[in-house]
Amino acid sequence: MHFSLKNLIAFLLLIAAATNAQTVSVLHEKKTNPSDLEVSGALTGLPTDSVRYITREELLAMPQVTYTPSGDTNFSGPTRIRGVRLEDLERALSVSPSSEMVVAVCDDEYRANYPQSYLAAHHPVLVLEINGKPPSGWPKDAQEHKFDMGPYMVSNPKFVPGFKIHSYVEEPQIPWGVVRIEFRDEKTVFDAIAPRGLFAQDREVQNGFSIAKQNCFRCHNSGREGGQKSGLTWDVLSQLARFSPKDFAAYIHSPINRYAKAQMPGFPEYDEATLAALTSYFQTFSKQAKP
């Protein structure tokens, strides 16, 4: 049988459409099991910000990777991980996998952000099994040894920091207690915390922005974007940075000493240059002159 180039392209597009339809068909409108993973955002074949669910069994039927992680602080000793790469999950479910970022949302409203640059560099994995066991057999959290790390978590096969800004070194994004995966437009998400005003492009402001995207944004929110675990919004942080830079720096170094309800760890390793960059960045959200 002879196919013209035009017919061949049409045939391939038909196959692609069928594949996408097949992918969307596995998503469910309602959650029927505690282990069902919520997915939302730009889902193929659905209106923007739709919410659907995918079962653990369906995730296990997707292409899997198996590895022993290196440098993952959630684990002590040799650990065998099995799961689905976030890139593969995005390709299967997202409308625009080449431009969408992945956001992992935890049961305590902590969020880990995976822009395209992170996905390409570190290939994070949605963990389905640890040492051959489902979440009920997983170890407790590494910090307090009392919290379940399921129903899902994210790990990196081998994390090698890709950049360093002053004393800040790129951090692995390895949340546990993950209950939702979002596929979001990267520009929209990060525009919510892009520096404001005349000095937005200042080098140190941009340095602070790069750090805040990876660190602060996990627990602090600006409107609907960002984590809400801390209870302190971007506006609160910006006001603190503007009116009391010393207290702002002290909060970063040791949160619990400045805010009794603080849950985030301190960052005593941040040097003056790192703190100055963060301070300059957050000050751009307040009405004032040069930060």
Residue ranges with predicted function:
Residues 1-9:
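Bacterial N-terminal signal peptides that target proteins for export
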